[in-house]
Curated annotation (Swiss-Prot):
UniProt subcellular location: Cell inner membrane
Name of this chain's protein: Threonine/serine transporter ThrP
Signal sequence segment: none
Organism: Salmonella typhimurium (strain LT2 / SGSC1412 / ATCC 700720)
Main localization, broad class: membrane
Amino acid sequence: MAEKKPELQRGLEARHIELIALGGTIGVGLFMGAASTLKWAGPSVLLAYIIAGLFVFFIMRSMGEMLFLEPVTGSFAVYAHRYMSPFFGYLTAWSYWFMWMAVGISEITAIGVYVQFWFPEMAQWIPALIAVGLVALANLAAVRLYGEIEFWFAMIKVTTIIVMIIIGLGVIFFGFGNGGQAIGFGNLTEHGGFFAGGWKGFLTALCIVVASYQGVELIGITAGEAKNPQVTLRSAVGKVLWRILIFYVGAIFVIVTIFPWNEIGSNGSPFVLTFAKIGITAAAGIINFVVLTAALSGCNSGMYSCGRMLYALAKNRQLPAAVAKVSRHGVPVAGVALSILILLVGSCLNYIIPNPQRVFVYVYSASVLPGMVPWFVILISQLRFRRAHKEAIADHPFRSIMFPWANYLTMAFLVCVLIGMYFNEDTRMSLFVGVIFLLAVTLVYKVFGLNRHGTAHKVGE
């Protein structure tokens, strides 16, 4: 009898999945990028987070509906392959892989900068290299151990945000750190009004805010390794998005209410200022540590996703079969190792280019358009998924809402965001980089005849 090959193991519990998704979504962008969006929109950035969150909610409910019936590793890439075509499955998997590689390299770069806060003479490539090693060890461990590591990584930044929101509410309503005098809501309407940046500033910020939600769909990547996936994923999809909304909107609300929006960024990080407001003198060091772990957590979640995407491509015969190799611990070791190798090469940019901020901006911005591809694919796949599962949908306990209008509205919204990115000088280049990448992988697909290898699955296979 042939020896059974190792397979991915269902070792992730609900708490692991929820924190993996939170860890991938709430990253350096919230801690370091809040000042940028406030610069453009003023207090109305709050509304931008709420609007973007509503459309992301529609995307997540669409994905949750499919995950309940088909909890497979690779989720939306597999659904694209199955319900659209092998090409779209291929394009989605590579787009998501590219997005997380770009995010991973940018966050590894950021880690080098954060460590220099304590050790200013240290070359930035040294902590970057150490971080790659730590991420590799975490991702090559058994999936349950990986889930535990990421759980505690993500818990650090989640706890920090919760504490900051509580402190901020105390300052706003009870005057903590302000001589007992409540600050109130004056800063939301003063200094130019709620829409201080005008509609142009609001729409510019909205384009950036949408990108900050990328990573929430990581829940889908965990589907093939979740314990009792129908129950676990249904719970995770519902909880994670609400928590992200509360953390993002709550943190930004506290910042723009306590401080005049036009002063944020000029006097340091708003997170540092909030903790310093109540007399925590070590605020800068605390926040630097939190942002360091946030970068590690985001990169860790990203490498998890990258390994599973390469595994899905190999299973669809769009990469060599060797890439689908799974260790005895149930880890897609070949896919993870290849992704870590690219991350290692990318981290060498820290040695070649002396300006870390330039590396961070260029690489991170390149991830925006490829990161949107899975969202479009989820919405389109679900339209066809419904037609293929008419009987199962009738008594489905986790159906998406406002179907199919929510799908069409969300796709229209995403198209508007892309148009807005084109007309914004700060984001136009990232759009071009994304287009070039998508054209390149399409060319590879056609030239190497990968369509001959990637046959579409039958429904229910």
